[in-house]
Amino acid sequence: MVIIRLARGGSKKRPFYNIVATDSRNRRDGRFIERVGFYNPVATKGEALRIAQDRLTYWQGVGAQLSPTVQRLVKEAQKAQPAA
């Protein structure tokens, strides 16, 4: 099953997450099919969250499931989008 979840990057104490579409059997930071966005929780200026909505819609259309954290981030991105 394909799942859209966070893959951790960055250094110690400075997390950075890629939002990726991957097979659910792969490791958290392992092989993925496609990167659909990123989330930087420690960003002070600049962009902290970007999601390619067209690719997210595509993956959901072919049956991909969102992890609970990605669901929360998608809602956050949709709230911020009309204001921008």
Curated annotation (Swiss-Prot):
Pfam hit, one: Ribosomal_S16
Single GO cellular component term: small ribosomal subunit
UniProt GO MF annotations: structural constituent of ribosome
Domain of life: Bacteria
InterPro entries, A to Z: Ribosomal_bS16, Ribosomal_bS16_dom_sf
Coiled-coil blocks: none
Gene Ontology process terms (BP): translation
UniProt keywords, alphabetically: Ribonucleoprotein, Ribosomal protein
Matching HAMAP family: Ribosomal_bS16
Family label: Belongs to the bacterial ribosomal protein bS16 family.
Name of the protein: Small ribosomal subunit protein bS16
Native source species: Burkholderia multivorans (strain ATCC 17616 / 249)
